[in-house]
Design a protein with these regions (language model features):
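Enzyme catalytic cores with a strong preference for nitrogen-chemistry domains
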Residues: 1-227
Length: 227
């Protein structure tokens, strides 16, 4: 949730935070209006009287779609069901955001001139049947995962194995971006993991626990994925 941060806790129930998050998105839309690049931003989004943990896809000042998180962890250090509503409980297939009526759903596919991609959020990857499996069957060649994945003993290696296997299973590229040093450390610690996989193989990774902003860049060979 790059706009608000993931560790806001009960502030996710505050109208002021939700309104300011939408105002921040409007500023980003205005600032990127002349850019062709597609951006995926994590933020809380109000749907009727509920709040979803969502990925918002934007390009050239327009919102292309909103993808709600499907599986909300509610165990150990996580209690997301206290604040958010699962995609499984949202019946609407569109939402009004920043004055635009945009598609919404955990099954959305986004097409570019070069490829088709889908999105899942954090815990979705850890589910028995991740949304990315269905997205790949529908034609997604690249999966993006916006995450707030905290650290634990042995967890990083497990995460890398999980992404590698899912990328190979889906025969896809998999781009994973997680929260870093800007999050609160009251309950947990975030390493800022950035990982790019292609069909099970690691292509690029960020430096863990870096105290500065990072950018990792790598090409994903979609022709190889299609072969």
């Amino acid at each position: 949730m790059c706009i608000t941060g993931y560790t806001c806790g009960d502030l996710f129930a505050q109208q002021l935070l939700l309104e300011q998050a939408e105002m921040a998105l409007i500023q980003i839309l205005n600032s990127t209006r002349q850019l062709d690049i597609i951006s995926i931003l994590g933020m809380p989004v109000v749907v009727n009287s509920t709040v979803i943990n969502a990925a918002v896809v934007i390009q050239k000042g327009k919102i292309l779609g909103v993808v709600p998180k499907t599986y909300l962890p509610n165990y150990k250090e996580f209690y997301e069901q206290r604040w958010f509503t699962s995609a499984l409980q949202v019946s609407e297939n569109s939402v009004r955001l920043c004055g635009q009526i945009v598609p919404m759903g955990n099954n959305l596919l986004f097409e570019t001139a070069e490829t088709t991609f889908g999105i899942e959020i954090c815990e979705d990857l850890w589910a028995t049947v991740p949304p990315s499996s269905s997205l790949a069957l529908q034609g997604a060649e690249i999966i993006f995962n916006l995450s707030a994945d905290d650290e634990g003993i042995g967890k990083h290696n497990y995460l890398c194995s999980l992404i590698s296997q899912q990328s190979a299973r889906c025969i896809s590229g998999y781009v994973f971006s997680s929260s870093g040093f800007g999050e609160s450390t009251t309950d947990v610690v975030f390493a800022g993991n950035g990982l790019i996989y292609e069909n099970g193989y690691l292509l690029a990774r960020s430096e863990r626990f870096c105290m500065e902003e990072q950018l990792i860049i790598n090409e994903i060979d979609v022709e190889c994925i299609r072969a």
